[in-house]
A protein has these predicted regions:
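Terminal alpha-helical segments
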Residues: 1-133
C-alpha cells in the first residue's frame, strides 16, 4: 500500500498527465498543426500515466521517456494494463527524437495517439481512485 505522500505525488503526476492529454486533444484536430507537439503531448500523457501506476504499485523506475521499458517493467511486476498500452512504445520517439529534429518525420496517427493516451489516463485514474479510497 502506498503512503499518503506517494499517493499525493502520484495524484500530482496524474493531473499533469491529464493536462498533456487535454493539450494533445486540443491540438490534434487542427490540420495546420505539426504532428510533433501532438505526438509529444500524447506520449507524455502515456508516460506519466504509466509512471503513476508504477509508483502506486511500489515499483521503482528510472528517469526515462522509453515507454517500452516502462511497459515491460510493469509487466515484470504483473501489473495488468489496457491492451492499447501494451504496444504504446511506438509513441516513444515523439518524446524527444522528433521534438528536437526538424527533419521529415513519419506521420502521426493522431486518433490512435489520443486513444492510447485516453486509455492510459483512465487506467491510472482508476488505480489512483482505488488507492485513495
Amino acid at each position: 500500500m502506498p503512503t499518503p505522500e506517494q499517493i499525493e505525488v502520484a495524484g500530482s503526476l496524474a493531473r499533469l498527465a491529464a493536462i498533456d492529454l487535454a493539450t494533445a486533444e486540443k491540438l490534434a484536430p487542427d490540420p495546420e498543426m505539426d504532428d510533433r507537439p501532438v505526438g509529444f503531448h500524447a506520449q507524455q500523457a502515456v508516460e506519466k500515466a504509466v509512471k503513476v501506476v508504477l509508483m502506486l504499485e511500489g515499483v521503482d523506475f528510472p528517469k526515462t521517456h522509453d515507454l517500452e521499458y516502462l511497459i515491460v517493467l510493469a509487466e515484470k511486476h504483473s501489473i495488468a494494463m489496457e491492451p492499447e498500452l501494451e504496444s504504446a512504445s511506438w509513441l516513444t520517439p515523439w518524446a524527444a527524437d522528433f521534438r528536437y529534429d526538424d527533419a521529415p518525420i513519419e506521420t502521426l496517427d493522431r486518433k490512435r495517439a489520443i486513444a492510447v493516451a485516453n486509455a492510459a489516463i483512465t487506467w491510472c485514474h482508476e488505480l489512483l481512485d482505488e488507492k485513495q479510497g
